Every structure is written in C-alpha cells, then in structure tokens.
C-alpha cells in the first residue's frame, strides 16, 4: 500500500512523526508532503492560486516540505512529486481534536477533503488534549482503527475523521456526527505591547456527537461529505418557492 501523509501542524511536528510510525504497520511506501510551517486553521484553502511561486524542499527520497497549505500539499504531491497515485491519504496527527465547528476551520480536515475529491480514501487523525499533549491513545489504537476502516471501506468523495480522546482509559470506538460547540463561547482579546491583539477563544461543548463522546473517553469516527448541500432544505424550497422565484426573470 502506498500512503501519502500530510498535516497542518507542519513538517517538523510530533504528530506527523507519530503518523509515519503508524503507517509503517501497513505501508509498502510512505510519502510525506507537509507544510513547512504551522498552517493550523487553513481549512481547504489554497496558496497556489494567489502566490507567484511555492517552494518545495526535499528532505530525503520521499519526504518534502512545501510553502503552502495542507490542501496545496496534497495537490502538489499528487501532480508533481509522486510518481504513482497513493492508495491512502493520512492527515495528522493533529494537536487537538477536530470536532464540532473545528471541522470547518481545520487544515487537517482540508487535506483529506482534497484527497477525497480525487476519489482517494483519506483519513484525518486528531488527538484531543488537556494541558500537555499525550499521544498514547493514538499510538496504541490508530493502527487498529485505520486497518479496520481500510478493510470495510467507505464511499468515494467521503473523508473519514478519527478523534482520539485524552482520557486515561478508552471506553471504545463509536461512529458519531461532528457535534456542536457554543460558537460564541468566551471570547477575549488582549492587547500586546506592539499594539497587536491576542485572541483567546474558549468554547463550551454542548455534548452532542463527537464533541461529547471524546470527553466521555471514546474514540470517534465521523464521515465527512464534500457536498455541503442541504438536500432536505433544497427540495423543500424547490417545492414551495420555485415558481415564486422564477417570476423574477419573467
């Protein structure tokens, strides 16, 4: 199996080193193409349409850092660096969970969405933490969860997101929706000596889906769609308002 690894925490992060060790359990080839700096919060954004150039730095035969976003890294890996299409894209391991609205902001998730858009099975891995980061649960359980997912498979154009709890004891593995935060939460700004602002955003967990499950000690698996369309609302609006809106141009 040929595996492409990327992340949003950067080429030198501990999480990507751990993911390389995890991938060795089932990979014949491992390629790493990751941002050269921390690009957390990049979502599925791209640098390459707006930058005149992107740097690719080769560290060894199959390991590269890129001056772009996680999504850039996947695109560049598939179209420039790799000579074969990978069988699997792995992104992470992220420092912190990717649940609730984090899914919209996360570069870790953005990378696997880029892979899924090209019909490549793609999995994001994120480790929750309280205080200092502890990778133990990911180290022990990630190889087993990934192997099971690859065995059972899932539809094309769907990415998988695995979140590992920070609890000392793992209660089990559950399939769960992304869940919800209180989006406003406790938002505070602190002015720095240079006049810039530091932002601290502490959001309340509402307890649903993966947000609540990882707090309870579960590893969660969440399928993520590329298509953002709400089909229930779309069909309801077509049935109720199509004629009214068509009159705008008639």
Curated annotation (Swiss-Prot):
Cited PANTHER family: 5'-NUCLEOTIDASE SURE, 5'_3'-NUCLEOTIDASE SURE
Recorded catalytic activity of this chain's protein: a ribonucleoside 5'-phosphate + H2O = a ribonucleoside + phosphate
The keyword Zinc-finger belongs to this UniProt entry's keyword annotation: no
Keywords of this entry: Cytoplasm, Hydrolase, Metal-binding, Nucleotide-binding
Family classification: Belongs to the SurE nucleotidase family.
Cofactor descriptive note: Binds 1 divalent metal cation per subunit.
InterPro entries, A to Z: SurE (IPR030048), SurE-like_Pase/nucleotidase (IPR002828), SurE-like_sf (IPR036523)
Location of the protein in the cell: Cytoplasm
EC number(s) reported in the record: 3.1.3.5
Biological function: Nucleotidase that shows phosphatase activity on nucleoside 5'-monophosphates.
Cofactor: a divalent metal cation
Taxon lineage: Bacteria, Pseudomonadati, Pseudomonadota, Alphaproteobacteria, Rickettsiales
Primary residence: cytoplasm
Gene for this chain: surE
Cellular component aspect of the GO annotation: cytoplasm
MF (Gene Ontology): 3'-nucleotidase activity; 5'-nucleotidase activity; exopolyphosphatase activity; metal ion binding; nucleotide binding
Amino-acid positions noted as binding a divalent metal cation in the UniProt annotation, renumbered to this chain: 8-9, 40, 94
Official protein name in the record: 5'-nucleotidase SurE
